[in-house]
Structure formats: structure tokens, C-alpha cells
Amino acid sequence: MEASKVFFTNMRVKNGDNLLKKLDRLMRAAGIESIDFDKRFTAIKMHFGEPGNLTFLRPNFAKVVADLVKEKGGIPFLTDCNVLYVGKRTQAVDHLNVAAENGFSPASCGCPVIIADGLKGTDEALVPLEGTTYVKEAKIGHVIMDADIVISLTHFKGHEATGFGGALKNLGMGCGSRAGKMEQHCSGKPEINTELCRGCGACKRACEQDAIVFDAEHRAHIDQEKCVGCGRCLGACNFHAVYSPNYVALDELCMKVAEYTKAVVQNRPCFHISIVMQVSPYCDCYGGNDMAIIPDVGMFASFDPVALDAACADAC
């Protein structure tokens, strides 16, 4: 099998040039113009950020992608699905308001924003899968499956459950409906080693499900009925008290993400872009972000999301 090609450009610019022009050249060099966009609905899958988080990709990058699609006769729109955990993006009204607050609009991006799984995160398409280990029928946001073409535009960063968040995470977890996200997360919920717990409350502050309770000795415990397995408490604890009781479950999560990605990309044209800048240790779903853990690396593009993730990880 021939190795997939991944194209790269660094973040350096000369006078008269800029990163937006470099992104346009990168996409063309990687072969995006080989896709027939004419009169075809093109979903640009990205993350609109959580209020207070400033590491999500700027709307300017989305506009470059949308403008190229329109140049080729396509009909682009920006999209994401609602999230599982409690926050500002669990339903489409708040989600659209967050996108607007963070600068994503037809005026700034040249195309509309559509929440792919509808008002309450229940508008899903059931996509049958063959040859998979865990997922036999993926629950994907209906708008994603209605699109003729999918382009993933990903902020590559760390992630507390999957190690890093790249194209596969953006496509697999990101395109899942709320029920689809639950299916991916549900195999592994964290627990707390009370001997290591300091009672600091960091895990409780990170939990938006109100699933953390304290006993008489002020040791934390997780209410498994309320827990959705998002893993935020894992990243919040500085004392290694929060852990996965079954590390195979994290492997299973990653495999489910990959299988959900297969449901999204199979049987239609797809193209993938990852931007490795402001690499925060955790995902952009938090209402804040830590400083970058490495210097900015560059921008990558490929028709193969697996090769793209591998290249980004290797470059870090």
C-alpha cells in the first residue's frame, strides 16, 4: 500500500505574506482542487470554542477554506454537533450564540453556521458500519451525513482522555450526536483513589455534571449515575487521585472515535486540515485554556486523517 501524503507549511512568514495566504497555498498543494465542489454542499467541521477559551482556531482560517470552496462552485457551511456535558454548547441556540460570540458568522467566515445534530442534539443519522470492533451503527449528526463533501478543520492540541485531539477526534467524537458521544464515552468512567485525594475540590469544579461528592472526611467520590465519562476530572487533579479503573477503556474510546470517523468519511470526498498552534494541554471544550506546552509548529493537510494525525503528533 502506498503511503499517504501529508503536506506541511511552517508558521513563518515573510513581509507581504501571511498565514491565511499560506493556508490557501497549502490546501491547493495538497490537492483539494481535485474534488468536484460544483453545487455540492460542503461541511467544514470545526470547533467553535467554549466561552472563555481562546485557543480555538480563529474564524479567519475558516473563511480561507470557505472562500476556496465557493471559488470552486461549492456551497460551504461551518458545522459542529452539540456536546454531551453540561455547558454552553449542549443545544443549538446556545451553541450558535457561542459561535457568534467567538466570531463565527456569515459576515466573518463567508458562510453560515449550522449545528449538525439539531436543536437538542437528537437529530441524528444512523450509519451502519462493517468490519468494526465496537460500533456497528454510528449515530452521526444528520446535517453531517446530508453533506456531499466533508472538510475537517482541526486545532491540534492535547486531550485528557485520548492523548491528543486531532482530525480523528474532530471527526469521530465531534460529528457524533449527543447519543453518539455517550456511546463513545460510556465504556470508561473515572474513579477516585481516596487515599490520594487531598479534598482540594479541583475535580468538583471541573465537573459540569455535579457528579463529584465529598464524604465526611472530605474525600471525593464520583456518582457513577451522573458521570458521563468526559474525563475532565482526570485533567483537573494534580495528585493523581482520579484514574481510569480500566485503561483498556481509554483504548476502547480511541477505537470508537476511529470507527465513528469511518462512518463520517466513508463513501464521499473528504479533505483534512490540522493547525498545530497554541497547543494547550487539554481540549478546547474547557471554559479556559492553559498556556501552550510547545511552540507553534505549522499547518498540515491531507486526504488521509490517520496519516494527518500521525504527522502532527510526530511533529510535536
Ranges and model annotations:
Residues 2-61, 71-80, 85-316:
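Extended, low-polarity segments enriched in aliphatic/aromatic residues
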Residues 66-67:
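Terminal amphipathic helices with adjacent charged low-complexity linkers/tails
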